[in-house]
Amino acid sequence: MLTSPTYDGLVSDVKSIAEVVHRRNIPLIVDEAHGAHFGFHKAFPENAVAYADAVIMSVHKTLPAFTQTAVLCLCSDRIDEKEVEKYLGIYETSSPSYVLMAGIERSLRMVSDGGSELFAAYVEKLSCFRASVRDLKHLAVPDAEDFSGEEAYAFDPGKILIVTKNGMSGQQLQEILLRDYALQMEMTSGNYVVAMTSFMDTEEGFGRLSHALHAMDARMEDTGKAAFSPKDIYRQPEKQMEPYQAEEAAHGSVRLEEAAGQVSADYIYLYPPGIPMIVPGEILTEPMIQIVRQCQEAGLDVEGLPETDIINIVKNARIDYN
């Protein structure tokens, strides 16, 4: 199973990955929650349905549909349709919302009937916005060419990443945009925010965002400091035991400053996007604890801790990692 695109709009090489797994007759499932708009215009990446065996798309994320609406696309005979129907019967509600289902149909009909015109206008608005913010000095709005091949195979231009270059945290940037300019961002991270767009956004909306960024940029100064980046946040801790073993073991709680060498009993993550920084069974190191602290101090939403300075650990599993 593969997530593509990411919350930030980074897209994997689904075609090549599919070729590898299909040579071993393994089905490929793609979580394309943020890519329901792919494939309607050449400016956007290809839709994963061309290569994967099953694709899940959250229609409500990038198309005009009600929250909670999504579709499951079965794309090859490697996935047993009857088996899928069996489990849908087990897990789906027996009282589905016809309002939500009608919303999906209306959204798909909209892009089916007028998608070419809608997406052409959308791409033009995105291009004009990106051109308007290239002169920013203390903020940056990356384009596809700003990502190396190692970071992403492709990039969704509909995701607007606004990166700080003067030490301001993503949380501070989001708060200013909301408080002073009534602009709500989708997500914050260490040194950037993500603005979600769709073909329903207007020229006026893109203009307001461009104006806000220029106004903020003009007031910023070069502090010589840098906010910690996502590369600092997501490291690969050492695993002491499997997650299920850690979850089934006896647990205790310790203060964060006393947790170095302990084995985590919980998932610790920022939400959004929900990618774990620490997984049950992994060894808590001093650098990892400092990253959790940095995230808290930056105002990011750290989930999984029972209290701000408390973490659940596996009893009698302490490791001397020095």
Q: Where are the language model's segments positioned?
A:
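Non-catalytic surface loops within mature trypsin-like serine protease
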Residues: 76, 166, 199, 315-317
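Charge-dense polyanion-binding interfaces
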Residues: 301-321
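Generic secondary-structure boundary signal with a strong preference for alpha-helix termini
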Residues: 21, 43, 119, 194, ...
